[in-house]
Amino acid sequence: MVLAAARVLLLTLAALGASGQGQMPLGGDLGPQMLRELQETNAALQDVRDLLRQQVKEITFLKNTVMECDACGMQPARTPKLTVRPLSQCSPGFCFPGVACTETANGARCGPCPEGFTGNGSHCADVNECTAHPCFPRVRCINTSPGFRCEACPPGFSGPTHEGVGLAFAKANKQVCTDINECETGQHNCVPNSVCVNTVGSFQCGPCQPGFVGDQASGCRRRPQRFCPDGTPSPCHEKADCVLERDGSRSCVCAVGWAGNGLICGRDTDLDGFPDEKLRCSERQCRKDNCVTVPNSGQEDVDQDGIGDACDPDADGDGVLNEKDNCPLVRNPDQRNTDGDKWGDACDNCRSQKNDDQKDTDKDGRGDACDDDIDGDRIRNPVDNCPKVPNSDQKDTDGDGVGDACDNCPQKSNADQRDVDHDFVGDACDSDQDQDGDGHQDSKDNCPTVPNSAQQDSDHDGQGDACDDDDDNDGVPDSRDNCRLVPNPGQEDMDRDGVGDACQGDFDADKVVDKIDVCPENAEVTLTDFRAFQTVVLDPEGDAQIDPNWVVLNQGMEIVQTMNSDPGLAVGYTAFNGVDFEGTFHVNTATDDDYAGFIFGYQDSSSFYVVMWKQMEQTYWQANPFRAVAEPGIQLKAVKSSTGPGEQLRNALWHTGDTASQVRLLWKDPRNVGWKDKTSYRWFLQHRPQVGYIRVRFYEGPELVADSNVILDTTMRGGRLGVFCFSQENIIWANLRYRCNDTIPEDYEAQRLLQA
């Protein structure tokens, strides 16, 4: 470009010289030709200048480019050296499709066959994964190449499509088909308002639901809301149930969460049987609750200030708060305490001798610690062979120094009275042979082959009523006797109602009318009463915590446990066959989050059922003998311990789940919800040991919050009732009620068929 511009300039100058013979005119008069040549020269110079500017830019760009290449290490392009490779040994098709081919010194080599095939890599055959049975039972498996495929889940089941490749996958991954609950999804043909029972892969239709009448053929119609079960008009409050009594009369009972006389019901927040506000009726249960939010079914109020002891910070009104008062229920502002135990002189039954337990066996006002005749049988303790059981005759058949009245082996000498399983039968004579499973060993069972935990023997002939065809021994067989438990050979029946005059209104002749008798067919049991109870410590040798402290109120119908303790039971002495057991459960503190509950079917300290409720998930702090993890929620367990009370049973009770040779988990509330602080719950238990029927329900206020539904288990065929605690303080069990009941519930049969 520069050379070209210079060439143009030289040509122009030459032209100028040629035209003027080398001379420029001296005047200002330029000829036209000269002017034209100057203009052309000027234009040429302008072009040269532009070309020079462009050339400078290009040179600068080339310079910068070269410098940048030097900075990044780039070298001038070189022609690559040509190499000659030998011909590849891995020719197409040498290996099975999808198999890698590798050249080696010894020639080409094929890799393994793909998943779902077997062979040497060059030749691969399909694997039949169906031989591993990856599909759900009754589902067809289809082998593909490669892999397998399962057909859809069978009718009554649902699940995702299932397919895969390879034997390893087929063995490790089975088709999952989940039972369809047709009763929940509506995929059933049961008539509306009837019971639908889900079965594996199908369903069954049952009777009409409560509150409805009819059947599957005619349909289920709502029972008139204000009628009694016998069809007569109901006089009850809208929040009360009409109940038919044994004699055919009707009673009204307020529903859960309500209290009153049944004709009138009001809200009952704490579920203790007393309404929050006074009702317009005169019965005791119509009075206003003196502790609206704390259950106190006895309504105790020692200072008569209208505030119940259970919620009164100064129950005795002496100016000293309960938590510091050494006599919280007896007025003593001076707090005098001569013997220095936990109790002030005003309420201490042994003022000059320490006795924190305040036990008073004969209820004479003098504690056992300072009473020279503990049982009140007029025989002084040092010479009394049963110092805690009245026995003025001092009979001692086996001569072991322990009177028959308190001897756990009266026919066999055993002065130590050892009884490791707490069943009142000493180890010296305890055979543990109980073929009918009712908790009474065969040698002491009045019906050894028929479960009868209550051991009722109305005519005292040594043969239990359960296996005696003439219970009252009046010569009339039970099947024809209009008073089965009361002798009446004449069978008088003035009103011809089928019930003999001798037992009319009081079937067991215990002088408690059937309407209020909790066991109208057992003269030995009349009212709910836990005032006499057996204490069972389930970890007696452990050092984790202290033992429970039980306080009984309301004439034996309320129990309070005050301590953060080891696992323990308070067990009543009455044994039951079939029973209904209900009560109100309340933790009256915001401290701790552990177990509380109740027991039934108690036969000994190794054999019982327990319903227990944990508030929060927690691992037990004693890792020996094994790690135990408690989950929140309600649990129903069958305890059958091979070791009995101790660390093994302790950790097994804490653990949610089965523990071999200790505990089986029969049911757990699927909600996994713990109990709430200072909240009342009402439970209802039905136990029919003759068929293994168990069902437990929990209410929070009027709302049903948990239902085990029907559980069938015959581990314990009857036993005693009680309450349970484990590491939880300030538990209240209020408004306790039990009732003998051998009637089989209607929902038993459907469950039996389901489990058959």
Swiss-Prot record:
Q: Name one GO biological process term.
A: regulation of bone mineralization
SUPFAM superfamilies, alphabetized = Assembly domain of cartilage oligomeric matrix protein, Concanavalin A-like lectins/glucanases, EGF/Laminin, TSP type-3 repeat
Q: Which domain of life is it from?
A: Eukaryota
Glycosylated residues: list them: 120, 741
Alphabetized Gene3D superfamilies for the sequence: 1.20.5.10, 2.60.120.200, Laminin, TSP type-3 repeat
| Cofactor note (record) | Binds 11-14 calcium ions per subunit.
Q: Where is this region: COMP N-terminal?
A: 22-85
Mediates cell survival and induction of the IAP family of survival proteins: region residues: 526-756
What is the protein name for this chain?
A: Cartilage oligomeric matrix protein
